[in-house]
Regions:
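Electrostatic cytochrome c docking/interface patches
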Residues: 18-36
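The canonical Cys-X-X-Cys-His
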Residues: 38-48, 78, 82
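C-terminal capping alpha-helices of c-type cytochrome domains
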Residues: 68-94, 126, 169, 389
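Beta-strand-rich domains and repeat architectures in extracellular enzymes and scaffolds
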Residues: 106-136
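Beta-rich, blade/repeat-based domains predominating
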Residues: 113-124, 156-168, 199-212, 242-257, ...
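Conserved beta-strand positions in repeat-built beta-propeller and related beta-rich domains
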Residues: 129-134, 171-177, 215-221, 258-264, ...
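Short loop/turn segments that connect beta-strands within beta-propeller blades
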Residues: 142-146, 185-189, 229-233, 272-276, ...
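Blade-level signature of beta-propeller repeat domains, shared across WD40, Kelch, NHL, RCC1
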Residues: 376-411
Length: 411
């Protein structure tokens, strides 16, 4: 699957943006299948968006199957028409680097087509959760049986985005399109919502608990960070010192201080957990745009430099920063990232197909694998309690479990 253009097409699918995508009319070429494209695709997408997404005939059909059910004859006719008139465009290819570690990747198609799983969550009971951003649901998968269940969000079109779990097993999520944070009790399905106290905090993004049970979160477009006390629902917000810095990924260090990356600029920032004062650190390259961040046990931060195609390292103790070119090059668009047992894992979302990348800081060696479905942009990933990984494959409408089988002698 052709990951970047495909996911940009899939991003616009159904619930949240359906009405907004109907504008920007274009003139489609005459031919067999034109009327079906106008009837089926234009319900939720602008035809300009459709026309700008170039795929092969097979890839169009793969896309349909993850978004909507179409009769096979209609799917074939639409795919043939689009592939003829809007052919596949050149895109960066994945670079596969062999190595001593073996992994197996198993993917599951989630129940609601077109839901666009955004973030995955590996819970303490061994289940895998995901946010169905466009379907307005939270989903749960038991990877041992394949059983899945979806829980509808309380507020319509709230855009469930980030996910985390508290010590009681409740699932917390950010309602990215509704300015709220939600708590789901998976035993009852009951949801408690916490609205942002400031309307400018319109899009809560990444949530993470600290060691004291306080929920910290970023607010990307609102240019803020926040904290929520689950005991009383109190929310405090702080504005990023840099305008339009786009606070994005967030982690907590061993001392309980939240760190976040600023996707709109080349900065990493720390929040004082007591005063909520924000201190920013500027990364050396002005073109760097850190999107997600991971942290190792020594409190060193690792970030995906989405714009430059690099893996970055920042040591808060010394202020030193260093980076490495991602295997698939400057257009690889590193995205979801996690640290597991001292090893850095991340996704390359800009290549065809998306890749899973392993980086060993001790040897500075990379190893990569392709994601079977193509990935469709892996926006986030998380480590499981037993040392594996879970992924959300947004544009492919799937979640995945990566089982890591370490070879003898490998680190």
């Amino acid at each position: 699957m052709k990951s970047i253009a495909l996911v940009m097409f899939a991003m616009s699918w159904p619930v949240i943006a359906c009405a907004q995508q109907r504008g920007a009319a274009v003139q489609l070429p005459e031919g067999h299948g034109k009327e079906l494209v106008e009837a089926n695709c234009a319900r939720c997408h602008s035809l300009g968006l459709v026309a700008n997404a170039g795929f092969s005939e097979k890839d169009w059909q793969d896309l349909f199957s993850s978004m909507v059910k179409l009769p096979s004859d209609q799917s074939s006719e639409i795919a043939a028409y689009l592939a003829k008139n809007f052919p596949e465009k050149p895109k960066p290819r994945a670079v596969v680097i062999p190595g001593s570690v073996n992994v197996s990747i198993k993917e599951w198609l989630v129940p609601t087509l077109g839901s666009r799983p955004h973030d995955p969550l590996a819970t303490a009971d061994g289940n895998i959760w995901w946010t169905g951003q466009f379907a307005n649901v939270l989903g749960r998968l038991d990877p041992r049986t394949g059983a899945m269940k979806e829980f509808p969000a309380k507020t319509p079109q709230s855009g469930p985005h980030g996910l985390t779990e508290d010590k009681q097993g409740n699932i917390w999520y950010t309602g990215n399109s509704a300015g709220l944070i939600g708590k789901l009790d998976p035993k009852t399905g009951d949801i408690t919502e916490y609205k942002m106290p400031n309307p400018a905090a319109r899009d809560p993004h990444t949530p993470v608990f600290d060691q004291k049970g306080i929920l910290w979160f970023t607010v990307q477009g609102g240019n803020m960070v926040g904290r929520l006390d689950p005991k009383n629902g109190d929310i405090k917000l702080a504005t990023s010192p840099t305008p339009r810095s786009l606070p994005y990924g967030m982690v907590i260090d061993s001392k309980g201080a939240p760190w976040f990356v600023e996707f709109g600029v080349n900065k990493i920032a720390r929040i004082d957990p007591t005063t909520m004062e924000i201190k920013e650190y500027t990364l050396p390259n002005s073109e760097t745009r850190p999107r997600r961040v991971a942290i190792t046990k020594d409190d060193v931060l690792w970030y995906s430099d989405y714009s430059r195609g690099y893996l970055g390292r920042f040591d808060p103790k010394t202020g030193a920063a260093r980076d490495w070119p991602s295997p698939s090059g400057p257009q690889s668009r590193p995205y979801g990232i996690v640290a597991l047992n001292g090893i850095i894992w991340y996704s390359e979302s800009g290549v065809t197909p998306n890749t899973l990348v392993r980086f060993d800081p001790a040897t500075e060696k990379f190893q990569t694998w392709v994601i079977p479905s193509g990935g469709g942009v892996v926006r986030n990933m998380m480590a499981t309690r037993d040392g594996n990984l879970v992924l959300a494959c947004s544009g492919r409408n799937r979640v995945a479990l990566v089982t890591i089988n370490r070879a003898v002698g490998s680190r």
